[in-house]
Swiss-Prot record:
One of its GO terms (biological process) is intracellular signal transduction. It comes from Rattus norvegicus. Activated by phosphorylation on Ser-486 by an unknown kinase (may be mTORC2 but not confirmed), transforming it into a substrate for PDPK1 which then phosphorylates it on Thr-320. The active site is at D286. Residues 139-151 have a biased composition (Polar residues). It catalyses: L-seryl-[protein] + ATP = O-phospho-L-seryl-[protein] + ADP + H(+); L-threonyl-[protein] + ATP = O-phospho-L-threonyl-[protein] + ADP + H(+). This is Serine/threonine-protein kinase Sgk3. Two specific sites, one in the kinase domain (Thr-320) and the other in the C-terminal regulatory region (Ser-486), need to be phosphorylated for its full activation. Keywords: ATP-binding, Cytoplasmic vesicle, Endosome, Kinase, Nucleotide-binding, Phosphoprotein, Serine/threonine-protein kinase, Transferase. Belongs to the protein kinase superfamily. AGC Ser/Thr protein kinase family.
Length: 496
């Protein structure tokens, strides 16, 4: 059976996972909802499903595809359905089920699967392979996919320089792995991307934009840094800081919400990182708890720069529809021009979630959530300070021109009374002790990563270099398309 995700099917092969589950109550009934992350190209969204919905899909598909031998965890007749170990085991089984669905075009293009994953929803149909403001610019005629993407760096690094130990994350183009460099025993997070998938989705520009942003991050303490990058004939490799305190999302799911001092500390470090990006004319555009990591001491580290927009000065705007539904600003939903203040809206949404446990306008129905973001007044419940209420109201202002940060950007956030007790100088110098210590056991501790990832087998293909003599023409063309991807820092810094 064919497993090619790039042939003449409706769209790119989706990537799916179940990062978490949550308990809900409705009309005095208690049930577990599983949060399914779906990625197709540069679009990404969440779908919330109960076990009964997985079971219904399974029963429909097993009759139509008996040879597939699909399976899901069995219904539990006796025992506690809300036992944490049972829910964890069931989530792993359901994750395996949906992973199998997206391996086969016959399955992931089936109407029941597409409906289950909401793949045909109009809100997921935008094609961000090009920015909207760039589509209107006429492009010179070209008959080749080969492009020069920057200066060539150090070509000597190779996959065999590393021992690849664990899968610690997944995306639509590849995986992130914990790797140990053989030369000095240092641990890194290595992001491995498939060139063929990147090319088929016309994403070279976004990959190189991410690389460019990463190169600038070494100057800021709360942004993940790129040590170097290299490529084989089939894959691209980013060698990044390994940050093992866990996603903010991971800790927030476990603790539901944070005390205000802890939320303030994280918000300040996030704001500092965003302020730095803005100072070098970069808008982040995709702030969410899943993209905010904690290091081994408990400091914030912002990661994943694939949706960053470069070259945006304080008065500039852009129009691309991108981001994650729960955190989209009103002007993005309306497809109106937006500016740096989109990041301050997202900061408000993340701060609100840290304090209250859910994003500010959250609803399981995404269309209704969009309507809430556009029209519903902000609901500020008791339990937080007046200055917290104030900054949430000002960051989550629906009119971007009146939003906190609209006039003087990061300076306005720094000067807000909510942060009055903080020394921003001490913060950037990491002199303020974090309010929470992840208590990692060492540089290779992965306890704060989801077992859905870490229990996966490390693919052998990421560990080897391809031989040019045996690759086909399309792979060689892919290699030409990424001229300039490889990067090495100055030699004195290479093995620090």
């Amino acid at each position: 059976m064919q497993r090619d995700c790039t042939m003449d099917y409706k769209e790119s092969c989706p990537s799916v996972s179940i990062p978490s589950s949550d308990e809900h109550r409705e009309k005095k009934k208690r049930f577990t909802v599983y949060k399914v992350l779906v990625s197709v190209g540069r679009s990404e969204w969440f779908v919330f499903r109960r076990y009964a919905e997985f079971d219904k899909l399974y029963n429909s598909l097993k009759k139509q595809f008996p040879a597939m031998a699909l399976k899901i965890p069995a219904k539990r007749i006796f025992g506690d359905n809300f036992d944490p170990d049972f829910i964890k085991q069931r989530r792993a089984g359901l994750n395996e089920f949906i992973q199998n669905l997206v391996r086969y075009p016959e399955l992931y293009n089936h109407p029941d699967v597409r409906a289950f994953l909401q793949m045909d929803s109009p809100r997921h149909q935008s094609d961000p392979s090009e920015d909207e403001d760039e589509r209107s610019t006429p492009k010179p005629h070209s008959t080749s996919r080969n492009i020069n993407l920057g200066p060539t760096g150090n070509p000597h690094a190779k996959p065999s320089d590393f021992d690849f130990l664990k899968v610690i994350g997944k995306g639509s183009f590849g995986k992130v792995l914990l790797a140990k460099r053989k030369l000095d025993g240092k641990f890194y997070a290595v992001k491995v991307l498939q060139k063929k998938i990147v090319l088929n989705r016309k994403e070279q520009k976004h990959i190189m934009a991410e690389r460019n942003v990463l190169l600038k991050n070494v100057k800021h303490p709360f942004l993940v840094g790129l040590h170097y990058s290299f490529q084989t004939t089939e894959k691209l490799y980013f060698v990044l800081d390994f940050v093992n305190g866990g996603e903010l999302f991971f800790h927030l799911q476990r603790e539901r919400s944070f005390p205000e001092p802890r939320a303030r500390f994280y918000a300040a470090e996030i704001a500092s990182a965003l302020g730095y990006l803005h100072s070098i004319k970069i808008v982040y555009r995709d702030l969410k708890p899943e993209n905010i990591l904690l290091d081994s001491m408990g400091h914030v580290v912002l990661t994943d720069f694939g949706l960053c927009k470069e070259g945006i000065a304080i008065s500039d705007t852009t129009t691309t529809f991108c981001g994650t539904p729960e955190y989209l600003a009103p002007e993005v939903i309306r497809k109106q021009p937006y500016d740096r203040t989109v990041d301050w809206w997202c900061l408000g949404a993340v701060l609100y979630e840290m304090l209250y446990g859910l994003p500010p306008f959250y609803c399981r129905d995404v269309a209704e959530m969009y309507d809430n973001i556009l029209h519903k007044p902000l609901n500020l419940r008791p339990g937080v300070s007046l200055t917290a209420w104030s900054i949430l109201e000002e960051l989550l202002e629906k009119n971007r021109q009146n939003r906190l940060g609209a006039k003087e950007d990061f300076l306005e956030i720094q000067n807000h009374p909510f942060f009055e007790s903080l020394s921003w100088t001490d913060l950037v110098q990491k002199k303020i002790p974090p309010p929470f210590n992840p208590n990692v056991a060492g540089p290779d501790d992965i306890r704060n990563f989801d077992a859905v990832f870490t229990e996966e087998t490390v693919p052998y293909s990421v560990c080897v270099s391809s031989d040019y003599s045996i690759v086909n023409a399309s792979v060689l063309e892919a290699d030409d398309a990424f001229v300039g991807f490889s990067y090495a820092p100055p030699s004195e810094d290479l093995f620090l």
